[in-house]
Amino acid sequence: MASSSLPLSLPFPLRSLTSTTRSLPFQCSPLFFSIPSSIVCFSTQNPDREEVRWLREEQRWIREEQRWIREEQRWIRERESLLQEISDLQLRIQSLESRNSQLGNSIPDTISNIAALLQVLKEKNRISESGLSATPMVLESTREQIVEEVEEEEKRVIIAEEKVRVSEPVKKIKRRILKVGSEGDDVQALQEALLKLGFYSGEEDMEFSSFSSGTASAVKTWQASLGVREDGVMTAELLQRLFMDEDVETDKDEASTMKKEEAGNGAVFTSVTQVPEKKQSIVKDQSDREVDVTQNRVFLLGENRWEDPSRLIGRNKPVDRSESTNTKTRCITCRGEGRLMCLECDGTGEPNIEPQFMEWVGEDTKCPYCEGLGYTVCDVCDGKKNL
């Protein structure tokens, strides 16, 4: 770049030479007054350095432009791929719609064809049976052929109906996780299902349909009977298993009731032991199913649960002396189970410690009497179930 000049006018005020206050120490030369009033300034910057700087800036702009061009090309490619996917999906949807329409149109046609064939068969059978024609109208070969065609049409209709059923979405029952603090109809159904299996949740919990300490204790006892983790939380898998077990128990009760009604000339067989009758309740599942429950049970205060009536049936039957010599006597203490529920932790496996002392023990501390199992080995039969 060429050097630039900038004229500057600096008007210096000229004081009078004949000042009385201060005099110049030298003599004024006539050249001193010949200095022009405008001064020319020349640039001292290096033009090569400026040119190099501008070249660097231009290269940086070119690189930025190339980067934006690459980004734009990438966006264009992504847009084209998305448009291609959309077009492919639209084609698939159209093909599926056409296929469904063809299936829907073919089913009524096949049904009408089958109805027409059946009508023709009936008419021909009537004509042959009436004897109006001299020769039989339907030969055996043609009859077999028509029957085969009808069977094939029926198979096609069945296959088409199965395809339509498979295409329909299957609605599955979703159960929410139940734990301490839950409330509502799900908790009530859980409590009634546990009650039917012999696990009592407590009067207060069942009255307000709340998942509190009584329900948690019943759930833990039921989990201990299954051999799963005793955390007092009912997951979807455990709820499904609970209601399946409940259905099995209902089927067993119905079968035993049928056998009792058929035994002894229609007289119902009852045990000599008198047990209070439990009121009839209704177990409601989320699938709106209702099962009538009527059982004779005894509530065990020590174990906080209802006794299973199947264990009470047959206790007072006459014992055959000949058979008693060969068979072993079942343990009375554990009722032939070989184990007893731990009375210190009520079958939960957790230590029975007051809340103010829980800070002194660890979180994973288990009941020292049953070692967290919830039950102890029967000390009468040593777990052998028989004496």
From Swiss-Prot:
Residues 72-106, 143-163 form a coiled coil. SUPFAM superfamilies: DnaJ/Hsp40 cysteine-rich domain, PGBD-like. Keywords: Chloroplast, Coiled coil, Isomerase, Metal-binding, Plastid, Stress response, Transcription, Transcription regulation, Transit peptide, Zinc, Zinc-finger. The keyword Zinc applies. One of its GO terms (biological process) is plastid transcription. One of its GO terms (molecular function) is protein disulfide isomerase activity. InterPro entries: HSP_DnaJ_Cys-rich_dom_sf, Peptidoglycan-bd-like, PGBD-like_sf, PGBDSf. This is Protein disulfide isomerase pTAC5, chloroplastic.
